[in-house]
C-alpha cells in the first residue's frame, strides 16, 4: 500500500525567505525589517502578518486562507531559528503540528484529518526522515508503521487491517525492498510469502488460498521468473497473467 501522503504542501512556504515587501512595511537604514509586516494579495486580502526585529521574525506569524480563516500559525524562538507550527484545515480543525529548525522540519510532526483524528506521525532530524513513521485510518486506528534511517525506509515495515490484525510485514534496506516479506489474509493466514533482493523479487514466492491451500509457487531470479508451478489448474491462465501482484 502506498504510504498516505498527507498535508505536506504547507511547510517551507511559511518562512521568511518567502516574504515579499509591501509599501507599508518598514526597513531601517541597514535594510533590516522592523516592526509589523503584512503581505496582501491582489484583492487586498491578508496572506500573512507578523513582526520583525533586526530582520529576525518575532513571536507569532499567521497565514490565512482566501476567506480570511487562519491557515497556519508559527511561533518563533527569540533568535528566529526555530518555529513551532500549527496548520489548520479550512474548517478550522487542526491539520498538523510540529517544529521547524532553520526552515526544516525537526522532531515529531503530527497530522490530523478534518474529524481531528490522528492521520500520521513523522519524525525528522533537520529535515531528514528518521525513526518510526506511522499512518492511521480515518477512525484513528493504526494503518502502517515504517522505520526510517538517514531519510530512507530501513527495517521492518508493517501494515494493519482496520481491526488491528497484521496485513503485511516487509523489510527494507536503504529505501529498497530487501529480505523476507509476507502478506496475510484478515484471519492471519498467509496470502503471499517470499523474498526481495535489491528491490526485486528473488527466490521462491508462494501464494495461498484463503483456506490455506497453496495456489502457486513462483521462483524469481532478480525479478525475472525462472519457474512456475500452479496448483489450481482452473485458474492457471488467470494467475499467469496476474503473476500474483503484491497486495496494496
What is the meaning of each model-derived region?
Residues 19-248:
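Glycine/tyrosine- and acidic-biased, solvent-exposed loop/turn segments at the edges of beta-strands
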